[in-house]
Each structure stands twice: as C-alpha cells, then as structure tokens.
Amino acid sequence: MRISQFEGKAVALWGWGREGRGAYRALRAQLPTQSLTMFCNAEEVRELESLADAALHVETDASAQALGRFEIVVKSPGISPYRAEALAAAAQGTQFIGGTALWFAEHAQPDGSVPGAICVTGTKGKSTTTALLAHLLRVAGHRTALVGNIGQPLLEVLAPQPPPAYWAIELSSYQTGDVGRSGARPELAVVLNLFPEHLDWHGDEARYVRDKLSLVTEGRPRIVLLNAADPLLASLQLPDSEVLWFNHPEGWHLRGDVVYRGEQAIFDSADVPLPGVHNRRNLCAVLAALEALGLDAEALAPAALSFRPLPNRLQVLGSVDGISYVNDSISTTPYASLAALACFAQRRVALLVGGHDRGLDWHDFARHMAQQAPLEIVTMAANGPRIHALLAPLADAGRFGLHAANDLEHAMQLARDALGGQGGVVLLSPGAPSFGAYSDYVARGRHFAQLAGFDPAAISAIPGLGVH
C-alpha cells in the first residue's frame, strides 16, 4: 500500500519515536491537509501540539476500541502487533502497517522488484555488517544509502536526490515482516544468524524465527545470501529466490584470520577493525553480497581496513589506571555476551551482565562459563538476580568470581575492585536490553563511558548514516 492510497481514509499513527516522526513527515509530505491521529505517550503530547498542525489529533489511549476507529494505523516497529489491543483492532478490520512496508511499496517497480535494495538481518552483527557493506559499496564508487534499524528510518529518506544506486538496509525482527507485507521484492537479502531474542515482542521463539525469516520466505528477494553454518538457515527451502551461501568451504569463508573464496586465499583480515571472529565471518558475508551484485569483491576486500567501527559494539574506549574499558552495550542476548568474551579470551576480564528481563534462557551461557569463563562476572539490573543464581554453583566451585551489583555504577566499582589493581578489561556486554534503567542501549553505553572517565558524547555517532 502506497501513501497516496491513504487519501480520504481514517488514518492514525501509533508511536512518536524516531520511526513515528519519520512516518508523520512522510505522510504530511504527500497528504498535507488530511486528518491524522497520533497515539503517543502523555509526556509527548506537548511536543506534538507544538507542531501546530490543525489536522493532527493527539490521543494517549491506544485501546482496542480507539484503534478500531481507524481503517489504517501506521505502527512504529517497537510496538508488537501481537499486543491484545492490536489483535482486537485488527479483528475489527483495522489494517496495521509499518514504515518499512510503506517505503518498499513506494519504491517497488511494476513487477514488485526494488532494484538496489539490500536487506541485512540476523540476531547479531547486522548493524556492523550493513555499515561495512555500505562502506565498500561507496569505495567502489556507488552512491549508497545506509538506513533502517541502524539509526536512519527509511521514511526519512523516502526520495533523496539524486537517488542512490544501492540501499544498505538493516532490518530488525520487528521490521522483517513488513517487507513481505509490502508486496515488494528486494534485490538481495542477507541473513547472518538466528538466536532467540525479543521474545517479549514476538511471544515465543518459534514466532521470532518465523517473523525474522519472513524477509526471505514472504519477501521473496531476487537473491538470498545465508550463513551455511547456521542450522536453521541451512535447512531453508526458498524456491522463489536464488540462494547463495557464505561461511561455506566452497564460497567465502574464514580460516584463521584469512578470508578465502573456495580454496583461494584472498585477504588477511587480522588488521581489519572488526573485533571478534563473528565479525570477520560477517566480512565474508559482505564480500559474498558484493560478488552477488556483480562487483569485484576480491579487489574491494582490502578497503575493509579503512572501515570505522560502530559505537557500542565491542568499542574499546581506552585505558585508565591499567584497566581497558570495552563498551558492548548493543549486546542484548547471552549469545552476544559469549561472542564478546571470545574476543578477550587471553585477558583478565571482568564481565558486566544483566538488564531488562525478557525471559531469555541463560543456561547455554552458564554451560559455556563452566568450560571457559572470565576472571570475574558482575550481575546487575532486573535479570541480574536470575543470572546470579544460575552462575552461583560455578562460582562456588572456583570457576570465576561472582558479584551482584545494584546498578551500572556499582557494577563498575565491583569490577575494578575485583581486578585488584593488576590491570585487565572491564567489559560491558549485558546480554539484555536497557529498558527501565535507560532509554536505549546508546544511553547505557554513554553512561558506561562517563563512569569510566571518557567523554560520552564523543563515542555515540554512527558514521556514514544516510545517503553518500
């Protein structure tokens, strides 16, 4: 559905975050006088009233009855369509649509294709992979948009001039279903990996997997690039797409630090500013994507050396009094924390874990700690006590030191004390969202930097967003 089809209909927007702001501006650009209703939080009402938009009505009660008054509701990604009020309104005939679906519908050719649209998703590594893809496309001389979940909503760049040759689009599991629902087909979709996440939004693991994979099962991209080492992905059957693989001995893969294409050694990635084996494997995904687009991936590979790492993703802030501080605030699953730990396997590490509790299972994390653990673990925040109880038997057996903190500031003090003035690494890789204590993972990362003695404002910008 295109925005022009909203004309004359009862339309509301739900959510006044960055995605909601982008949706409002996109609708107003095409429908300047149409009546719209915005459902927002009470503290956002004043900001909306300051827009002085006489055709905009503001409400704070997004009940099933209120939502059911509208033919179309443009929903922000963070609002789950599985909420009771959304399901009830949908049963009454209300159509819910996301900004991602609108963008794809606006860009679709008559045959449904969206040339140059490259969608990247996965539980871990999708932001860095998308940014690296955009970086190498630009090095190759192509005007490229770096957009989506990475921090630039698609509807904020609906019709840039001149248009980019490629769109490097990061999609979260909140957005992947929008692509299929739009009726459009991306040129290429990359799926990096799948681990349980966002279960509070999706409801259960099976639905998370289904929603995540709807990008390729319902979106029917022209080309799909999958991680051959991920069992869930390896079993997919996608008859409507050309399926390619990375992390496979016959394609682009990693041996030690060396990137191979089949049996041919291409590039030593040891000096690429991508901490962790998982990130260098995702470099293989980027090179495979470039090749799938018809570009010379082998020639472009060395340009990865000039890539600027993203903030809050295994970001080394620096050292104070012999202790290095690493900000991995983006880590919102136990698997992400394990990947972060693997980057510092030979170091004295104090790991800070815990955050908003959305019911993820930490037993695999505990099993890994029984085999290879950091020197110290500090638990904190809402799910900290649950993690602490799970790890306590291992700590009692002498596998590592275990400490319980009230908040991040307390956790950092406990970590510094536990390292005992002998140097080491304080690693913030919470394995959980920041909700409750912070507005988002960026705010958590900034607070960590501030508490460590660094300028929080200097580490927060994602380079290269938008069209360049």
Swiss-Prot record:
Recorded metabolic or biological pathway in which this protein acts: Cell wall biogenesis; peptidoglycan biosynthesis
Compartment list: Cytoplasm
EC numbers for this chain: 6.3.2.53
Catalysed reactions listed for this entry: UDP-N-acetyl-alpha-D-muramoyl-L-alanine + L-glutamate + ATP = UDP-N-acetyl-alpha-D-muramoyl-L-alanyl-L-glutamate + ADP + phosphate + H(+)
GO terms classed as biological process: cell division; cell wall organization; peptidoglycan biosynthetic process; regulation of cell shape
Entry GO CC: cytoplasm
Keywords per UniProt: ATP-binding, Cell cycle, Cell division, Cell shape, Cell wall biogenesis/degradation, Cytoplasm, Ligase, Nucleotide-binding, Peptidoglycan synthesis
Pfam family, one: Mur_ligase_M
Entry binding sites for ATP: 122-128
GO molecular function: ATP binding; tetrahydrofolylpolyglutamate synthase activity; UDP-N-acetylmuramoylalanine-D-glutamate ligase activity
Role, per record: Cell wall formation. Catalyzes the addition of L-glutamate to the nucleotide precursor UDP-N-acetylmuramoyl-L-alanine. Has weak activity with D-glutamate.
Family: Belongs to the MurCDEF family. MurD2 subfamily.
Further comment found in the protein's record: The combined activity of MurD2 and MurL provides an alternative route for incorporating D-glutamate into peptidoglycan.
NCBIfam families, sorted: murD
Protein name: UDP-N-acetylmuramoyl-L-alanine--L-glutamate ligase
Organism: Xanthomonas oryzae pv. oryzae (strain MAFF 311018)
UniProt gene name: murD2
